[in-house]
């Protein structure tokens, strides 16, 4: 069903040419709309840069400030539930501004990484290897659409309910607009801005996921090549050595690819790790003490979306660490015992390098892994425990 509207989420046949960079098709389109890429025609650079400045000043600077001003301007009108709902989104929005800035600054690095993907694609000659690339490309685009559905559902669940209740869903401050007298205008403006904000946040969450997904694609292809070393009879020792050398080049390209992306994702995931415990903690307090049924459903969706910002990426990083161990096993288990001295010495050098796992760190501090992710999520329970011990929830009710 979805593939009728989004054809790139379906695996393409081998008769069509597909490149690894095609996994970013839908993501790049959204980024282009925010001014985060470059126009194809150079004569549009100036208007595009002006659009970039306008959109990002409004969304990354003025929008978080508008939520903060609303606290100062109309704090007494907030109920406890409304305040917590606004606070959890406001905190996440400030973090999202930093995440978007890191992603925007890393545009050139991401372009360098795509060039390296093109070089890795040149090694995919057999139908089996090309089919693997096609499958991962479709998976990358599918993840982008899936995140759009998850994130959009949060807005769709919130906006109609609060509109019918004649209450503002996110309590933003708009100068020269009376939010009570011009309720529908301010509510529609809130809905539009929140939708744009979550799509910006989506880009910062999906970009690392798809990028490392394509890294895992080529790691899996390299594992298969390592298994097949010296498996074709009738070749000379020089040809076997050249085959091993090509695998070493592939591994070097993979390391360069990850190194190009490392500074881009380091800051993004670091900010999210700092936020996830606090945001989930505030959401859990709101859910446990102040939510109605409908606002509780919306809060659960928000908590799910916040968890999706780090969980899939951390899980993928763990899988890549395991893949690196498997790569060294594949090389060691290949048919090298009858090889000449040159081949064996090259293999030993390569085996040593393969045993170094491909890892990412958040801000140069936290290793990006499921263990770190779970440790940060546990902070949410610490926040709830503090609130319950001091009976703060009862005081606000």
Curated annotation (Swiss-Prot):
Descriptive protein name: Odorant receptor 22a
Mapped to this chain, the residue ranges on the Extracellular side of the membrane are: 71-86, 158-182, 281-286, 378-397
Any one Pfam family match given in the protein's UniProt record, by short name: 7tm_6
Any idea which UniProt keywords this protein has?
A: Cell membrane, Membrane, Olfaction, Receptor, Sensory transduction, Transducer, Transmembrane, Transmembrane helix
Q: How does it assemble?
A: Interacts with Orco, via conserved C-terminal cytoplasmic loops. Complexes exist early in the endomembrane system in olfactory sensory neurons (OSNs), coupling these complexes to the conserved ciliary trafficking pathway. Interacts with snmp1.
Identify its membrane topology class. Answer: Multi-pass membrane protein
The source organism is Drosophila melanogaster
What InterPro entries does the record point to? Answer: 7tm6_olfct_rcpt (IPR004117)
Q: Superkingdom of this entry's organism?
A: Eukaryota
Tissue specificity is:
Expressed with Orco in 17-20 sensory neurons on the medial-proximal edge of the antenna. Expressed in the ab3A neuron which responds to ethyl butyrate.
Locations listed in the record: Cell membrane
Chain ranges sitting on the Cytoplasmic side read 1-49, 108-136, 204-263, 305-356
Q: Which GO terms describe its molecular function?
A: ionotropic olfactory receptor activity; ligand-gated monoatomic cation channel activity; odorant binding; olfactory receptor activity
Key word Cell membrane present: yes
Which regions span the lipid bilayer? Answer: 50-70, 87-107, 137-157, 183-203, 264-280, 287-304, 357-377
Gene behind this chain?
Or22a
Q: Name one GO biological process term.
A: monoatomic cation transmembrane transport
Q: Does the keyword Ligase apply?
A: no
Name the major location: membrane
What effect on the protein does mutating residue 8 to Y have, as reported in its record? In strain: MA74
Provide the Gene Ontology terms for cellular component.
dendrite; dendrite membrane; membrane; plasma membrane; sensory dendrite
Phenotype upon changing residue 196 to A = In strain: CN1, CN13, CN18, CN21, CN28, CN29, CN45, CN51, LA120, LA128, LA13, LA15, LA25, LA3, LA32, LA34, LA35, LA4, LA6, LA9, MA21, MA24, NC1b, NC100b, NC16a, NC37a, NC84a, NC89a and NC97a
Protein role: Odorant receptor which mediates acceptance or avoidance behavior, depending on its substrates. The odorant receptor repertoire encodes a large collection of odor stimuli that vary widely in identity, intensity, and duration. Involved in the behavioral responses ethyl butyrate and to esters in more general. Complexes with Orco to form odorant-sensing units, providing sensitive and prolonged odorant signaling and calcium permeability. They are necessary and sufficient to promote functional reconstitution of odor-evoked signaling in sensory neurons that normally respond only to carbon dioxide.
Outcome reported for the amino acid change (mutating residue 359 to I): In strain: LA6
* Family membership noted in the UniProt record: Belongs to the insect chemoreceptor superfamily. Heteromeric odorant receptor channel (TC 1.A.69) family. Or2a subfamily.
Consequence of substituting residue 102 to L: In strain: NC97a
The note filed under miscellaneous reads: The atypical heteromeric and topological design of the odorant receptors appears to be an insect-specific solution for odor recognition, making the OR/Orco complex an attractive target for the development of highly selective insect repellents to disrupt olfactory-mediated host-seeking behaviors of insect disease vectors. Odor-evoked OR currents are independent of known G-protein-coupled second messenger pathways.
Outcome of swapping residue 386 to I = In strain: LA6
């Amino acid at each position: 069903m979805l593939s009728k509207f989004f054809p790139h989420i379906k695996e393409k046949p081998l008769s069509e040419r597909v490149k690894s960079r095609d996994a970013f098709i839908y993501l790049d389109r959204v980024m282009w709309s925010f001014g985060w890429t470059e126009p194809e025609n150079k004569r549009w650079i100036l208007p595009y840069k002006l659009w970039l400045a306008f959109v990002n000043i409004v969304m990354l600077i003025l929008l978080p400030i508008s939520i903060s001003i609303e606290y100062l301007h109309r704090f007494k009108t907030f109920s406890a539930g409304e305040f917590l709902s606004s606070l959890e989104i406001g905190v996440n929005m400030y973090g999202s501004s930093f995440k978007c800035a890191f992603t925007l600054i890393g545009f050139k690095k991401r372009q360098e990484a795509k060039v390296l993907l093109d070089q890795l694609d040149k090694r995919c000659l057999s139908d089996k290897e090309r089919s693997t690339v096609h499958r991962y490309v479709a998976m990358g685009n599918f993840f982008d659409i899936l995140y759009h559905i998850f994130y959009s559902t949060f807005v769709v669940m919130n906006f109609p309910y609060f509109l019918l209740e004649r209450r503002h869903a996110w309590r933003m401050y708009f100068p020269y607009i009376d939010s009570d007298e011009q309720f529908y205008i301010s509510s529609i403006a809130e809905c539009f801005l929140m939708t744009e904000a979550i799509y910006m946040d989506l880009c910062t969450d999906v970009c690392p996921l798809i990028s490392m997904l394509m890294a895992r694609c080529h790691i899996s292809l390299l594992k298969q090549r390592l298994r097949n070393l010296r498996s074709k009879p009738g070749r000379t020792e020089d040809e076997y050595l050249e085959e091993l050398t090509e695998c070493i080049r592939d591994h070097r390209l993979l390391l360069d690819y990850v190194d190009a992306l490392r500074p881009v994702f380091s800051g993004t995931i670091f900010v999210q790790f700092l936020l996830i415990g606090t945001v989930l903690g505030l959401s859990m307090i709101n859910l446990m003490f102040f939510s109605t049924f409908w606002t509780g459903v919306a809060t659960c969706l928000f908590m799910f979306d916040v968890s999706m910002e780090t969980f899939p990426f951390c899980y993928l990083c763990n899988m890549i660490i395991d893949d690196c161990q498997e790569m060294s096993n594949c090389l060691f288990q290949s048919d090298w015992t009858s090889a000449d001295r040159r081949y064996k010495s090259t293999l030993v050098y390569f085996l040593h390098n393969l045993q170094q796992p491909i890892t990412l760190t958040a801000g140069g501090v936290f290793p990006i892994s499921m263990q770190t992710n779970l440790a940060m999520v546990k902070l949410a329970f610490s926040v709830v425990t503090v609130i319950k011990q001091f009976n703060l929830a009862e005081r606000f009710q």
